[in-house]
Amino acid sequence: MRQKAVFVLVRTAVLAALALAFQSLGLHQYITGPVINAILYVAALFISPWSGVAVGIITPWAAFLVGIMKFAPVIPVIIAGNVSLALISGYVGRYQKHLGLGLAAVVKFLVMTGGIKYLIMTGTKVPAPVYAAMTLTQLFTALIGAVVALAVLEGLKTFDAKRRHEST
C-alpha cells in the first residue's frame, strides 16, 4: 500500500513540475491554457482525480508567485475551476472518457464565469482582459486541452501496456 502511495505522489509531482515548467515559459494563454488543462486531465485520469486537484491548486499559486498571473483575486476562481475539471473528468471519465472531459470543460467554464461575476458583484474591479481570460476563453482552452489529453492518455495506455507486458 505504501509503495502505491509513493508512486502516486511521484507521478503527481512530475506532472505538477511539468505544468510549472510550461507555465514559466510565458507563452500566450491559448498555448499555455490547453497544455495546463491537458496536464490536469491526465493527472485526474491516469493517476487519480485528487492528483488532478493537487496540480490544479498548485498551478495558479505558482503563476501568481512568479508574476504570470498578476490579479490575485482570481486565484480562488481559477482553483475552483481547476478542481471542478479534475474531479469531473477523473470520476466521470472513468466510465465515459469523452463525456467526462467535455463535461469537465463546460463545468470549469461555468464555475469560473460564475466566480468572476461574483467578484464583480462584490465590488472587485476586474480588468476587461482578466474577465475575458477567465470566462469564454476557459471553455476553449479546456476543450483543446481535452483533445490533447486524449492523445496523451492513449500514448500512456500503450506505454503502460508494453511496460506491464515486459515485466511479466
Language model: regions and residue ranges:
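Loop-helix junctions at membrane interfaces
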Residues: 1-168
